[in-house]
Amino acid sequence: MAKNVLDLLMWHPKWDIERCRISYLHRGACRNLKTIRGSDIERLERGFMILRDGSSIPYHRVVKIVCDNSFIWKKQKKGIG
């Protein structure tokens, strides 16, 4: 789950969330996808993250997390059957 990965990136001394990019579904954006920097995140709440500009993004919209050009997490597509 994206929340667990973001918590780890935010609080574990090995990781630096400011070196990460988070892509999420955003209707109206190019390809309905928008990417923010980890430094744009002010805090993590139970069901969503709060950005420094005051907006919020639900975790279920996060599709991938990349740090230092390496995939850290990617949302799994739901299969049929």
Swiss-Prot record:
It comes from the Archaea. InterPro entries: MJ1316 (IPR040459), UPF0248 (IPR007547). Belongs to the UPF0248 family. This is UPF0248 protein MTH_1281. The lineage of its organism: Archaea, Methanobacteriati, Methanobacteriota, Methanomada group, Methanobacteria.
